[in-house]
């Protein structure tokens, strides 16, 4: 009996990439491969790549160089680059790393088995053409047994001037509601408690599907999808990401308030707190529009948590315009902001814009914004002190094996004493005893805590 071939996947970038990696891992295991913790022990190495920022892209090339050297010594090694760098670079990757066997864009993740068959037949394969994304019936190899990603829409039709995503992930393609519900029902049967609906621009869900209502709305929207999946037995929590302010609606907020399984957490990038910068970014909304969304959320769901993304030092951004971003962060009081200094990406209009800012300015503004974000997050955390929060226990605290960790409905990370063997996958009441900017510590109040 032959020894099973081993595979290793390294994933860079966003939640969409993580979900794609889980699907590709499932395909490989369906083909008989087994997981290897170490890339150097694997017979197949796959890098699922991100090109949103230059440093992530350069890290990929560093990893690839090491595996290319290994393949020269071990010709049977299968070397694959998937994801956004693969889509962006295409055949030029083969010139840069001729040891590669397969270059495949994100739209081809579900076709990995077919593409591998071509590789095994002796071909060096580049799969970056735009295709209809096929439904995948293979079981993903998910990183968690408690929470799961569920892709509902692929691609993006927006044309933000700094962003390469539409170029590498293609046009928007929504999955049918019935297929999404079927996947969630399967997850529930496997014991999953929480699902996160994923889309690069999830508020665009359904606008490419046929049909409209008598009122002129799209027949299928994210709001309608939440109602479609909400009653799946066994699923206790529903989240979604990432929202776009241009398409975010009050109807969606009211649905979230009405549906008890939908968590009180919204991730809505604002990117800049200055209208002129937003216009240069082609974001399609104003600061005032963003603040109205925040106001609506807090009017309808007062305890909701709001997180965001922000970019500093966009080409031509003045000190005054940057300070407008600081003002917005202070005014909203976000629970979390993912921050980044602007990084020019090939093929985007902003990369060729005049007035590119220096690295010194970028790092100064990033540091100042991060300081304010942490301060605001610490202030927001204070409201949890002494409260009892429902926490879904997911794992052992990697820094303290005597503790478990999980998340509140508002997505705050919580640590508490206990053993994962007893608590994994449980929704437990936790009294919060300590707060920090981005995490909480508490004490489990349920009877199960007595055995911890």
UniProtKB/Swiss-Prot annotation:
Reaction(s) catalysed by this chain's protein: N(6)-dimethylallyladenosine(37) in tRNA + (sulfur carrier)-SH + AH2 + 2 S-adenosyl-L-methionine = 2-methylsulfanyl-N(6)-dimethylallyladenosine(37) in tRNA + (sulfur carrier)-H + 5'-deoxyadenosine + L-methionine + A + S-adenosyl-L-homocysteine + 2 H(+)
Residue positions binding [4Fe-4S] cluster 1: 14, 50, 84
Domain MTTase N-terminal positions: 5-121
Compartments, as annotated in UniProt: Cytoplasm
A GO term from the CC aspect: cytoplasm
EC number: 2.8.4.3
Record note on cofactor: Binds 2 [4Fe-4S] clusters. One cluster is coordinated with 3 cysteines and an exchangeable S-adenosyl-L-methionine.
Domain Radical SAM core: 142-379
Domain TRAM: 382-446
Any Pfam family: TRAM
Matches recorded under PROSITE patterns: MTTASE_N, MTTASE_RADICAL, RADICAL_SAM, TRAM
UniProt key word tRNA processing: yes
Co-factor requirement: [4Fe-4S] cluster
BP GO terms, sorted: tRNA methylthiolation
GO molecular-function terms, A-Z: 4 iron, 4 sulfur cluster binding; metal ion binding; methylthiotransferase activity
Residue sites binding [4Fe-4S] cluster 2 per the record: 156, 160, 163
Keywords: 4Fe-4S, Cytoplasm, Iron, Iron-sulfur, Metal-binding, S-adenosyl-L-methionine, Transferase, tRNA processing
Subunit structure: Monomer.
Family matches, as HAMAP family: tRNA_metthiotr_MiaB
Function: Catalyzes the methylthiolation of N6-(dimethylallyl)adenosine (i(6)A), leading to the formation of 2-methylthio-N6-(dimethylallyl)adenosine (ms(2)i(6)A) at position 37 in tRNAs that read codons beginning with uridine.
Family in the record: Belongs to the methylthiotransferase family. MiaB subfamily.
Name recorded for this polypeptide: tRNA-2-methylthio-N(6)-dimethylallyladenosine synthase
Source organism per UniProt: Synechococcus elongatus (strain ATCC 33912 / PCC 7942 / FACHB-805)
């Amino acid at each position: 009996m032959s020894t099973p071939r081993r595979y290793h996947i390294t994933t860079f970038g966003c939640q969409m990439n993580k979900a794609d990696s889980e699907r590709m891992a499932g395909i490989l295991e369906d083909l008989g491969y087994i997981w290897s913790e170490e890339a150097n022990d694997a017979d197949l190495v796959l890098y699922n790549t991100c090109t949103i920022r230059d440093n992530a892209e350069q890290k990929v090339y560093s990893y690839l160089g090491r595996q290319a050297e290994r393949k020269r010594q071990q010709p049977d090694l299968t070397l694959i680059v998937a994801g956004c760098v693969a889509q962006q670079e295409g055949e030029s990757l083969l010139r840069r790393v001729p040891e590669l066997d397969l270059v495949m864009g994100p739209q081809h993740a579900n076709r990995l088995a077919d593409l591998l068959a071509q590789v095994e037949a002796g071909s060096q394969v580049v799969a970056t053409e735009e295709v209809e994304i096929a439904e995948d019936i293979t079981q993903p190899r998910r990183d968690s047994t408690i929470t799961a990603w569920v892709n509902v829409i692929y691609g993006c039709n927006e044309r933000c001037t700094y962003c390469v995503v539409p170029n590498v992930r293609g046009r928007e393609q929504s999955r049918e509601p019935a297929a999404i519900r079927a996947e969630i029902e399967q997850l529930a049967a496997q014991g999953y408690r929480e699902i996160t609906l994923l889309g690069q621009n999830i508020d665009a869900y359904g606008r490419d599907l046929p049909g409209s209502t008598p009122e002129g709305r799209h027949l299928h929207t994210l709001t309608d999808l939440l109602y479609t999946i909400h009653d799946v037995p066994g699923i206790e929590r529903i989240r979604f990401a990432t929202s776009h302010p241009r398409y975010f609606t009050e109807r969606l907020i009211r649905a979230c308030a009405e549906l008890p399984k939908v968590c009180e957490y919204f991730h809505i990038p604002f990117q800049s707190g200055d209208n002129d910068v937003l216009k240069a970014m082609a974001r399609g909304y104003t600061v005032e529009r963003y603040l109205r969304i925040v106001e609506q959320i807090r009017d309808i769901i007062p305890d909701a948590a709001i997180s965001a993304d922000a970019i500093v030092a966009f080409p031509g951004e003045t000190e005054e315009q940057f300070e407008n971003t600081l003002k917005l962060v202070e005014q909203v009081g976000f629970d979390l902001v993912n921050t980044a200094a602007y990084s020019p990406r090939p093929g985007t209009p902003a990369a060729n814009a005049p007035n590119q800012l220096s690295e010194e300015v970028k790092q100064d503004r990033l540091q100042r914004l991060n300081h304010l974000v942490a301060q605001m997050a610490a202030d927001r955390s204070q409201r949890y002190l002494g409260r009892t929060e429902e926490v879904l226990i997911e794992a052992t605290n990697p820094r303290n094996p005597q503790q478990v960790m999980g998340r509140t409905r508002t997505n705050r990370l919580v640590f508490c004493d206990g053993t994962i063997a007893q608590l994994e996958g449980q929704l437990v009441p936790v009294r919060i005893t300590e707060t920090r900017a981005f995490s909480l510590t508490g004490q489990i109040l349920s009877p199960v805590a007595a055995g911890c």
